[in-house]
Amino acid sequence: MLVVLVGMMGAGKTTVGREYAKRHQMRFVDCDHEIEARTGVKVPTIFEIEGEAGFRRRESQLLDELTHETGLVLATGGGVVLDPANRAVLAARGIVVYLNVPTQVLWERTRNDRNRPLLQVSNPRERIESLYRERDPLYREVADIIVDGGRGNPGGMVRQVEKAIQNFHKKTCEH
């Protein structure tokens, strides 16, 4: 089984994904962390040197590579859905879970994080809202499952994801 988590920065993809993988004896990969490990530099440095387009190319290559694996939980970068080719890969491979979190919670979780290049603007809160408006329909387009959350603890969100995946399996087995 391949589980792919999508959602905005700060939605909890890494936290939820790591815990889900641990509970189900699966391998966990965070795309941003994997890109950093392979390049030897942080994401903001890649943005600085190669621009967002360069980073997105690396992200697309990694997504295509990793989504051929099974026994994997993959936390994607928030912007992975911007590329139609990535959306096609997501739609064709694995179970895609959209962690949908209110923008207020996203803001609270990310406002002090300097490792988020897209938020290094004069009004980061407005930027989060703008990115959400742009990306939410794309996350919904690729998602097999939508889990609304953000206010509870990460364990609660992991349980929601587990239950949603169980229900998804039941539905797909019935057809």
Curated annotation (Swiss-Prot):
UniProt keywords, alphabetically: Amino-acid biosynthesis, Aromatic amino acid biosynthesis, ATP-binding, Cytoplasm, Kinase, Magnesium, Metal-binding, Nucleotide-binding, Transferase
Known EC number: 2.7.1.71
Biological process, per Gene Ontology: amino acid biosynthetic process; aromatic amino acid family biosynthetic process; chorismate biosynthetic process
Domain of life: Bacteria
Example of a GO MF term: shikimate kinase activity
EC category: transferase
A Pfam family annotated for this UniProt entry: SKI
Cofactor(s) required, per the database record: Mg(2+)
Catalytic activity, reaction form: shikimate + ATP = 3-phosphoshikimate + ADP + H(+)
Quaternary structure note: Monomer.
Similarity annotation: Belongs to the shikimate kinase family.
The protein's name in its UniProt record: Shikimate kinase
Gene from which the chain derives: aroK
